[in-house]
Design a protein with these regions (language model features):
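A general structural motif
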Residues: 97, 120-122, 205, 231
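Conserved SAM-binding loop
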Residues: 101, 125, 190
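Active-site signature of alpha/beta-hydrolase-fold catalytic machinery across serine-
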Residues: 110
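Catalytic core of membrane glycerolipid acyltransferases/transacylases, capturing the structured
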Residues: 114-134
Length: 258
């Protein structure tokens, strides 16, 4: 049989890898009808490109290329200073009398903590995040509404049709959401169900804010739920690279935390 060219072979190997995360030399030889030597060389080439890790007798996908969802507890310890800075910046934009939506995510939990510590503002908060709710529920100046629905323990969020139906009827002065990845003109998250809720909240807000730390730029995740050019503002930390600042400013306003 005529062998496919190298580029095609490498694509095929990556496709096979994406299915279960690991692959053996034998599977490659059987599938692509190539020699042991060629199979090994192909894996070496993909490893050099940073797309996989060679193992004894095969290879495995590098976890950075596979969207891995971390729990909100695990995420809490990541980039904490940056998240606090972002939350402070976002908090400063919330005015007395505002009705706001706060989505799930550790940066938004931080925003809830900032809001709780702030005196003299009466606001209304709607959230589908249990951690956010638990922070704000004993505040005397915040009218609080928790959206119920199907519970996702990994992020502490309520999602699904029940949450969507309730959200559709609501309007906000500002919506604050987070995401796992920002690439080109889109923002993405791991769960389509969470993405849908965030999409609805943004659609129903006069001002739309995305809170992401600078590690989220040029990353990929599973479900694209919004376009950057439909947002009013991205709030990020001051570690954002000049390249990312320039690239993503063509779509929307980027506000750097102090």
């Amino acid at each position: 049989s005529l062998h496919m060219n190298k580029k095609r072979r490498l694509e095929k190997i990556l496709d096979m890898l994406k299915i279960d995360g690991t692959i053996t030399i034998k599977e490659i030889i059987d599938e692509l009808d190539i020699s042991d030597m060629t199979a090994r060389r192909d894996l070496d080439a993909l490893e050099a490109d940073g797309l996989l890790t060679r193992t004894h007798g095969g290879a495995q996908l590098l976890s950075s290329k596979k969207p891995l969802e971390k729990t909100h507890i695990e995420k809490k310890s990541l980039n904490t200073k940056e998240k606090i800075d972002i939350a402070k910046k976002a908090c400063s934009l919330i005015k007395d009398g505002d009705t706001i939506f706060i989505g799930p995510g550790t940066t938004l939990v931080q925003l809830a903590l900032e809001l709780k510590g702030r005196k003299g503002y009466k606001i209304r908060v709607i959230t589908n995040s249990l951690p956010v709710f638990l922070i704000l529920n004993d505040s005397e100046t915040i009218d609080l509404l928790l959206l119920g629905g199907e519970y996702r323990e990994i992020t502490g969020a309520f999602v699904g049709s029940m949450a969507s139906t309730n959200l559709k009827a609501m309007r906000f002065a500002k919506a604050f959401v987070s995401a796992n990845a920002v690439t080109h003109n889109s923002i993405a998250t791991y769960s389509d169900k969470e993405g849908v809720i965030q999409q609805l909240a943004l659609n129903n807000a006069v001002e739309k804010f995305l809170l992401v730390d600078s590690t989220k730029f040029d990353r990929y995740d599973f479900f694209n739920f919004y376009n950057l050019d439909q947002l009013d503002t991205i709030i990020t930390d001051n570690q954002i690279s000049p390249q990312h600042l320039e690239e993503f400013s063509q779509y929307t306003t980027i506000l750097k935390a102090d």
